[in-house]
UniProtKB/Swiss-Prot annotation:
Residues annotated as signal peptide: none
Subcellular location(s) of the protein: Membrane
GO CC, alphabetical: membrane
Organism listed in the record: Arabidopsis thaliana (Mouse-ear cress)
UniProt-recorded name of the protein: Sugar transport protein 2
GO annotation, biological process: monosaccharide transmembrane transport; pollen development
Key words of the record: Membrane, Sugar transport, Symport, Transmembrane, Transmembrane helix, Transport
Cytoplasmic side: 1-22, 471-498
Tissue: Pollen specific (at protein level).
Length: 498
């Protein structure tokens, strides 16, 4: 049964573009990979602020946290503690590389299954961890799950969705990331006062992994992946099922042509880096992920409880503040889901950059003026104002760079280098997330509130990047992206031969 029907944007081939129940179900199930990712992002900051967790694994950090005269900005500065958060993303880089080959050779569906299995085993290992080695080992397996999932899920959704609805359906991945973050912050709040509560928090990661594992048995492989692997008839059958119509020849032929070009490419990475036509999507896709991480968002997502405790909030108050922030994150992502295929990508990205710049600069100014090296901020007004500003900042990210940092790289590459190109985007995400996770607390200790001004300047730079270098991609079939967008862009057309 069709949920809706509309032709794609004028100027592109008029593929029938029904949004069927089959497509919607496949996209929702696949997007649970975002729930896994979000849960992990949200859980680590709360766990690392729990006294029971610090006593079990980082007693020296616990002691430093409770010193009366400890520098406010340096309470949690510890390389091993930061490695607990960041080790996952280091593993994710390697896993994404492997996944790009697995996905091309065996398909998107089995790769998504593997992601859920890695994540499930990692969650069980963390739940039962008795020493730091087990804890880090579990994080590495979680990293493999995240690497496989983040590499494959957005591609899966982009390939299975009609062009007219691709943006909104892909935003579901980011929406479930925000739901995962919100769920994790609430779980941390509930478990923070329990003995060994950190085990329940970390073990909770098994829930989204199980949902994805079971759900992956009910999704279709993408037609593009089937046809790319020589299964033309199966690809045609799946295309009819997910489109809900018999007349799929036009779209099938377009995919078939793209796969014929793709199968001639024996070394996708060599093709990606040596062919001039691939340079525009490579630069834009990779830089979008770089900028997404250097908005400063994971400073808030990883370490929000730590930041609120740094300002003098108690453990419970800091966790409640985090729940509020993450609730705003989820609500704002819904706005993106509703407007992304109407407003377009560029408009949201530029507005988000402006909103985040203003709030980061203001937060930096407030902390510079009011948070001294020793002792909490006096009164409740300043922490409340900072909380409101963080909510405004998070909403700006959630309806722009959050979902679109994943969506745009998944829709701009030609099929022959799509896995390789998207790997570069995911790898950039993992590298930058590792850097933030591993070094932010140390940077906070050294640069203090000036760090927020740094992120504000980065937001200005990325807004200018969108203005001058990123084409609008809404409503354009992936197979036509080069012809309709890159070849006509004033700064990128020189890379295409006539």
């Amino acid at each position: 049964m069709a949920v809706g029907s509309m032709n794609v944007e004028e100027g592109t081939k008029a593929f029938p573009a029904k949004l069927t129940g089959q497509v919607f179900l496949c996209c929702v199930i696949a997007a649970v990979g975002g729930l896994m990712f979000g849960y992990d992002i949200g859980i680590s900051g709360g766990v690392t602020s729990m006294d029971t967790f610090l006593l079990d694994f980082f007693p020296h950090v616990y002691e430093k946290k409770h010193r009366v005269h400890e520098n406010n900005y340096c309470k949690f500065d510890d390389q091993l503690l930061q490695l607990f958060t960041s080790s996952l993303y280091l593993a994710g880089i390697f896993a994404s590389f492997i996944s790009s080959y697995v996905s091309r050779a065996f398909g998107r569906k089995p790769t998504i299954m593997l992601a859920s299995i890695f994540f499930l085993v990692g969650a069980i290992l963390n739940l039962s961890a008795q020493e730091l080695g087990m804890l880090i080992g579990g994080r590495i397996l979680l990293g493999f799950g995240i690497g496989f999932g983040n590499q494959t899920v957005p591609l899966f959704i982009s390939e299975i969705a009609p062009a007219r609805y691709r943006g909104g359906l892909n935003v579901m991945f980011q929406f479930l990331i925000t739901i995962g973050i919100l769920a994790a912050s609430y779980v941390n709040y509930l478990t923070s006062t329990l003995k060994n509560g950190w085990r329940y928090s970390l073990g909770g990661a098994a829930v989204p992994a199980l949902i994805l594992l079971i759900g992956s048995f009910f999704i279709h492989e993408t037609p593009a992946s089937l046809i790319e692997r020589g299964k033309d008839e199966k690809g045609k059958q799946v295309l009819r099922k997910i489109r809900g119509i018999e007349d799929i020849e036009l779209e099938f032929n377009e995919i078939k042509y793209a796969t014929e070009v793709a199968t001639k490419v024996k070394s996708p990475f060599k093709e990606l880096f040596t062919k001039s036509e691939n340079r525009p999507p490579l630069v834009c896709g990779t830089l979008l992920q770089f900028f997404q991480q250097f908005t400063g968002i994971n400073v808030v997502m990883f370490y929000a409880p730590v930041l609120f405790q740094t300002m003098g909030s108690g453990d419970n108050a800091s966790l409640i503040s985090t729940v509020v922030t993450n609730g705003v994150n989820a609500i704002a992502t819904v706005i993106s889901l509703l407007v992304v295929d109407f407003a377009g990508r560029r408009c949201l990205l530029m507005e988000g950059a402006l909103q985040m710049t203003a709030t980061q600069m203001t937060i930096g100014g407030i902390l510079l003026a009011h948070l001294k090296l020793v002792g909490p901020i006096t009164g409740h007004a300043v922490p409340l104002i900072v909380l409101i500003l963080i909510c405004v900042y998070v909403s700006g990210f959630a309806w722009s760079w959050g979902p679109l940092g994943w969506l745009v790289p998944s829709e701009i590459y030609p099929l022959e280098v799509r896995n390789a190109g998207y790997f570069c985007a995911v790898a950039m995400n993992m590298v930058c997330t590792f850097i933030i996770g591993q070094f932010f607390l140390s940077a906070l200790c050294r640069f203090r509130s000036l760090l927020f001004f740094f992120f504000g300047i980065m937001n200005i730079i990325m807004g200018l990047f969108v203005v001058f270098f990123l084409p609008e991609t809404k409503g354009v079939p992936i197979e036509e992206m080069a012809e309709k967008r890159w070849k006509t862009h004033p700064r990128w057309k020189k890379y295409f031969k006539d």
